[in-house]
Design a protein with these regions (language model features):
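Short hydrophobic/Thr-rich beta-strand motif most characteristic of the beta2 strand and flanking loop
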Residues: 24-38, 45
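Conserved acidic segment of CheY-like receiver
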Residues: 1-21, 55
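Conserved binding/recognition cores within well-folded domains
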Residues: 115-182
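CheY-like receiver
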Residues: 44-45, 49-126
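Short loop/edge segments at beta-strand edges and connector loops
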Residues: 37, 105-106, 170
Length: 182
């Protein structure tokens, strides 16, 4: 999952990035986290926004604040889930103006990030099939639409995916049946 964090404070970006990485490790999700330090910089990165599946925005940033950034991004990407993150509770109602998916306070991120991510991932995945296999590399969850192709090499099958390649020792017809039933 491609996640963007936009916050002008490097310590806050690192804290959130670490919490998300810990969550991904605990729940067996793989996140590609990209960080930006300004709303202006983020709005210029169209290819990153097109690939983004979840955006965390600090509200109180210099120059272009998180609310203005969210408004600009939502104009082009209305379905992109945006989580507003701030140290100030008085901004909570402003989140409704930009149709934010969530509002998180920085001082209790560690306590709220898991529930937030559980809910957001469930919403994002509602229309995507998740497959779980025991590969040579370990048990890995994949989105069906992330599989590019499967190739047979000797006694194993190799999955070529957006995440990389994974090997499994199963017959191809067994894999076909599993994929049909998932």
């Amino acid at each position: 999952m491609n996640i963007i964090i936009c916050d002008d404070r490097i310590d806050d970006r690192k804290n959130l990035s670490d919490l998300l990485s810990d969550y991904g490790e605990k729940k067996n999700y793989e996140f590609a986290i990209t960080e930006y330090d300004s709303g202006e910089q983020l709005c210029e990165e169209q290819s990153a926004l097109e690939a983004c599946q979840l955006l965390f925005l600090d509200i109180n940033m210099q120059w272009m604040d998180g609310l203005k950034t969210a408004m600009r991004i939502k104009e082009k990407y209305p379905k992109l889930p945006v989580v507003l993150v701030t140290a100030y509770m008085n901004y909570a109602l402003d989140g409704y103006k930009v149709k934010a998916s969530r509002f998180l306070l920085k001082d209790n991120l560690a306590d709220t990030i898991e529930e937030c991510m559980d809910d957001l991932i469930a919403e994002i995945n509602k229309n995507r099939r998740i497959l779980e296999f025991r590969f040579v590399e370990g048990t890995i969850k994949l989105y069906a639409d992330d599989i590019i192709y499967i190739e047979t090499e000797l006694h194993k099958n190799v999955f070529y995916t957006e995440k990389g390649t994974f090997q499994i020792y199963k017959k191809l017809d067994e894999l076909e049946n599993e994929l049909k039933n998932m």
